[in-house]
C-alpha cells in the first residue's frame, strides 16, 4: 500500500515536471520569436537569461543557442512523459514486464541524447563566449551517468522478465 502511494506521488511530480518543462520550452521559443523584431527582448530571454550579446554578434549563432535550449527542455519534458507512461504501465503484482523494460530503455536513450545536446550546446557557447568575452549559460553534462544507471536497471528488469518467464514455464 505504501509503495502504491509513493508511485502516485511520483506520477504527480512527473506530470508537474512535464508541464513545467513544456512551459519553459514554449516561453523560450515565444521570447525568441519576439526578439527577432525587438533585440531588447534577448536581454531577458527567460528568467534573466541575457543572450543579447550573442544576438548582436550573429543572428545565426543566437538562433542555434536558443534552439539548443528549446530542444533540451523539450527532450527533458519527453523524458518526464516517459516516466509518466512507465508509472501508468507499472503493475506491482508483476513489476518485471516488457513494458517497464522498454520504457526504461527509452528513458535511458532520451537522457543520453540530452547529454549529447548539452555537450554540443556548451561547446558552441564556450567557443563564442570565451572568444568574445560573452556571458555563458551552460548546461550540466552529468546526464551520461544517469543514462548508464537507468540502462543498467533496464537490463536488470530484462533479466527479471527472463527469470519470471522461466519460472512460469516450469510450473
Sequence positions of predicted segments:
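Alpha-helical transmembrane segments and their helix-start/interface "positive-inside/aromatic belt" motifs
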Residues: 4-25
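Alpha-helical transmembrane segments of integral membrane proteins, especially early/N-terminal helices
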Residues: 22-44, 70-74, 104-111, 166-171
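Membrane-helix boundary elements
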Residues: 51-76
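Hydrophobic alpha-helical transmembrane segments of integral membrane proteins
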Residues: 93-127
Amino acid at each position: 500500500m505504501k509503495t502504491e502511494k509513493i508511485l502516485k506521488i511520483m506520477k504527480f511530480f512527473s506530470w508537474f515536471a512535464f508541464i513545467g518543462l513544456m512551459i519553459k520550452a514554449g516561453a523560450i521559443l515565444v521570447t525568441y520569436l519576439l526578439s527577432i523584431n525587438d533585440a531588447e527582448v534577448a536581454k531577458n530571454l527567460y528568467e534573466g537569461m541575457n543572450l543579447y550579446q550573442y544576438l548582436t554578434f550573429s543572428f545565426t549563432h543566437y538562433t542555434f543557442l536558443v534552439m539548443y535550449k528549446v530542444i533540451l527542455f523539450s527532450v527533458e519534458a519527453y523524458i518526464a512523459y516517459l516516466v509518466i507512461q512507465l508509472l501508468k504501465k507499472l503493475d506491482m503484482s508483476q513489476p518485471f514486464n516488457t513494458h517497464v523494460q522498454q520504457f526504461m530503455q527509452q528513458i535511458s536513450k532520451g537522457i543520453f541524447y540530452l547529454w549529447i545536446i548539452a555537450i554540443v550546446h556548451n561547446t558552441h557557447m564556450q567557443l563564442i563566449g570565451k572568444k568574445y568575452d560573452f556571458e555563458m549559460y551552460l548546461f550540466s553534462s552529468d546526464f551520461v551517468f544517469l543514462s548508464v544507471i537507468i540502462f543498467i536497471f533496464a537490463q536488470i528488469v530484462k533479466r527479471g522478465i527472463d527469470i519470471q518467464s522461466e519460472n512460469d514455464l516450469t510450473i
